[in-house]
Swiss-Prot record:
Species whose genome carries this gene: Arabidopsis thaliana
Pathway the protein contributes to: Amino-acid biosynthesis; glycine biosynthesis; glycine from glyoxylate: step 1/1; Photosynthesis; C4 acid pathway; Amino-acid degradation; L-alanine degradation via transaminase pathway; pyruvate from L-alanine: step 1/1
GO molecular function per UniProt: alanine-glyoxylate transaminase activity; glycine:2-oxoglutarate aminotransferase activity; L-alanine:2-oxoglutarate aminotransferase activity; mRNA binding; pyridoxal phosphate binding
UniProt EC number: 2.6.1.4, 2.6.1.2, 2.6.1.44, 2.6.1.-
Subunit and partners: Homodimer.
Protein name per Swiss-Prot or TrEMBL: Glutamate--glyoxylate aminotransferase 1
Family: Belongs to the class-I pyridoxal-phosphate-dependent aminotransferase family. Alanine aminotransferase subfamily.
Gene Ontology terms: biological process: glycine biosynthetic process; L-alanine catabolic process; photorespiration; response to hypoxia
Length: 481
């Protein structure tokens, strides 16, 4: 048969190289089992509403009115919606050129970008320029836009933390770049060692790779740690000395579960460092409506802010953004509402504060329940989830399991996670999908299942793990820590 213009053999090699473990083999098998009638608990993706988190009322009211502006003319609208939601809907509609169905500026609505800049200034105490803020279809799209500008070919390297969120490895592969790993220290609660960074850069350069940028994920995904101010300062100095663009993935900044180490933005630390750092270090920071107590993953709202990028570079990024014409307009309004929520004295404030506080307090309790649950299991060790939405326990696998995985043609942690899925319906992501040190195995699960279901889920995991360890324990030891 004649070769088709597009088949697997003629596919772009970069497409074939890119992998995204969060929706990989485990997810596909979980979907098959669900179709067969098995109850599946999808803890593989940070997707709060899919696991029962209720949407915040106020933003849904505002966007509902924006989607159906004829309701604003209904004489009964004041009986169905609070006055502040009505006022905000009118405000956002006034920013558009024809409602939510009309394209916006390719950078996003100027009025919403102004709200984002004001939010950043309140958070950090330093000015923010709306002209250097682009609204995007989720933070992921923004990350892809910036990496597309940084990566010129496979000779360009991006420093990425390992374990890492596979958005980065997949996008770098897709764009034809080279991922340069730097390993986080699990024994130090996934801390970052600058000496390790220097070693990673030196090794990459010895192989002819030009390291162009560095990624930090704060709070961490999948590792759940919060970077200290001192650590961020070290990173910024490192980027200054090595002339690297810093990409600050800060999408989990609302998800903080301990008081000792609050979220501090890279922009704030950079500005506090003063000249020459504050004038020279190039920083792009990302945020989203998908995480925190909003959890509006399906809305696809995000932004990035650029610091110290030359005007001509910003113009080129704008040009490329213009190819897609406009980010999702309703998502832009969600972003405006996230950075400018109801304030004390507003009609909707009490309900908004009650709902958001309730979600965060429940997430904090669930983080503790899951950490304690994992640490009660045989051959499982888990650092406390300081932030984000995930637990990342290490599983010490018996040598019998390593042998069985090899015979099955599976990576050991994939083998374990598949067995867990088949036995319990819990769909996780194997640590190998995020990168890990050789011979060490993990899995990632979200802390998002309903709080009242968490004890049963952890009991189910413990029962499976005990049986797995017994079945494959051949008295020849376990994988290393």
């Amino acid at each position: 048969m004649a070769l088709k213009a597009l088949d697997y053999d003629t596919l772009n090699e970069n497409v074939k190289k890119c992998q995204y473990a969060v929706r990989g083999e485990l997810y596909l098998r979980a979907s098959e089992l669900q179709k067969e009638g098995k109850k599946i608990i999808f803890t593989n993706v940070g997707n709060p509403h899919a696991l029962g988190q209720k949407p915040l009322t106020f933003p849904r009211q505002v966007v509902a009115l924006c989607q159906a502006p004829f309701l604003l003319d209904d004489p009964n609208v004041g009986m169905l919606f609070p006055a502040d939601a009505i006022a905000r809907a009118k405000h956002y509609l006034s920013l558009t050129s024809g409602g939510l169905g009309a394209y916006s500026d390719s950078r996003g609505l100027p009025g919403v970008r102004k709200e984002v800049a004001e939010f950043i200034q309140r958070r950090d105490g330093y000015p923010s320029d709306p002209e250097l803020i682009f609204l995007t279809d989720g933070a992921s799209k923004g990350v892809m836009q910036i990496l597309n500008c940084v990566i010129r070919g496979n000779g360009d390297g991006i420093l990425v933390p390992v374990p890492q969120y596979p958005l980065y490895s997949a996008t770098i592969s897709l764009l034809g770049g080279t991922l340069v790993p730097y390993y986080l220290d699990e024994s130090e609660n996934w801390g970052l060692d600058v000496a390790n960074l220097r070693q990673s850069v030196a090794q990459a350069r010895s192989q002819g790779i030009t390291v162009r940028a560095m990624v930090i994920i704060n709070p961490g995904n999948p590792t759940g740690q919060c970077l200290s101010e001192a650590n961020i300062r070290e990173i910024l100095k490192f980027c200054y000395n090595e002339k690297l663009v810093l990409l600050g993935d800060e999408v989990y900044q609302q998800n903080i579960y301990q008081d000792e180490r609050p979220f501090i933005s890279s922009k704030k630390v950079l500005m506090e460092m003063g000249s020459p750092f504050s004038k020279e270090v190039q920083l792009v920071s990302f945020h989203t409506v998908s995480k925190g107590y909003w959890g509006e993953c399906g809305q696809r709202g995000g932004y990035f802010e650029m610091t110290n990028l030359p005007p001509r570079v910003v113009e080129e990024i704008y040009k490329v953004a213009s190819i897609a014409l406009s980010p999702n307009v309703s998502a832009q309004i969600f972003m405006g509402l996230m950075v400018n929520p109801p304030k004390p004295g507003d009609i909707s404030y009490d309900q908004f504060a009650r709902e958001s506080k309730g979600i965060l307090e429940s997430l904090r309790r669930r983080a503790r329940l899951m950490t304690d649950g994992f640490n009660s299991c045989k051959n499982v060790v888990c650092n406390f989830t300081e932030g984000a939405m995930y637990s990342f326990p290490q599983i010490r696998l018996p040598t019998g399991a390593l042998q069985a995985a090899k015979q099955a043609g599976k990576v050991p942690d994939v083998f374990y996670c598949l067995k867990l899925l088949e036995a319990t319906g819990i769909s996780t992501v194997p640590g190998s999908g995020f990168g890990q040190k050789e011979g060490v195995f993990h899995l990632r699960t979200t802390i998002l299942p309903a709080e009242d279901e968490m004890p049963e889920i952890m009991d189910s995991f413990k029962k499976f793990n005990d049986e797995f360890m017994t079945q494959y324990d051949n008295n020849f030891g376990y994988s290393k820590m």
